Regions:
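Conserved active-site alpha-helix within GNAT-family acetyltransferase domains
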Residues: 109-110, 134-152
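Conserved GNAT acetyl-CoA-binding A-motif
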Residues: 119-131
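Conserved beta-strand-loop-alpha-helix junction that forms the acyl-donor binding cleft
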Residues: 129-140, 156-160
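A short, well-structured alpha-helix characteristic of acyl/acetyltransferase catalytic modules
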Residues: 1-2, 7-45, 171-176
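Acetyl-CoA-dependent GNAT
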Residues: 39-102, 118, 168-170
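Terminal substrate-recognition subdomain of acyl/acetyltransferases
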Residues: 145, 153-176
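Conserved acetyl-CoA pyrophosphate-binding loop and the N-cap/start of the following alpha-helix
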Residues: 102, 106-115
């Protein structure tokens, strides 16, 4: 089955809030064993309403059923400066599969491939960065299978992350 990506809308807020309560989503967003919600209680209505070319969310669907989400940001320009000082012309991604029964079917690979292709369709984008938790070794393997390479550990807020990077040249070489 093929994944379709579409812009997130305010109609998706209840779904995103529900996914935030699922243990597998929480486990990918924090190492805090007492956490009861993913993404530190993000206000999804505010996030979606603030969508721009600098930061926006997509919903992944299979046969019209939402199964996951992605966030795409320009880490140099986004207002929270989560990534700190970074070079220009990067994109940063977050991905999560919300529906438990959609895990392990290759949908994440389809989601990432579509978004990576879209990011590199902009000739100014030189690389994509991503920050899985250092403890999330499944995510490390997933990103490395897509061609991302480890840059190193970094703490974001209170999270110990292992930053990965995919350079345009490496992606293009893998697509030949």
């Amino acid at each position: 089955m093929t994944v379709t990506l579409r812009p997130a809308t305010l109609h998706d807020v209840p779904l995103l809030q529900a996914w935030d309560l699922l243990p597998h989503v929480i486990a990918c967003t924090t190492d805090d064993p007492t956490a009861t919600t993913a993404f530190e209680g993000t206000d999804w209505a505010e996030e979606i309403a603030a969508a721009s070319g600098v930061s926006y969310h997509l919903i992944a669907e299979v046969d019209g059923r939402p199964i996951g989400a992605m966030q795409i940001i320009d880490p140099q320009l986004e207002p929270t400066h989560y990534w700190g000082d970074v070079e220009p012309n990067l994109r940063a991604l977050d991905i999560w599969i919300g529906e438990t029964d959609a895990l392990g079917h290759g949908y994440g690979t389809q989601m990432m491939t579509q978004v990576i292709d879209d990011a590199f369709a902009d000739p100014s984008v030189t690389a994509i960065i991503i920050d899985p938790l250092n403890s999330n070794t499944d995510a490390h393997r997933f990103y490395q299978r897509l061609g991302f390479r480890v840059i190193g550990r970094r703490t974001f807020d209170d999270d110990d992350c292992l930053v990965h990077r995919l350079d345009r040249a490496d992606w293009e070489a893998s697509r030949r």
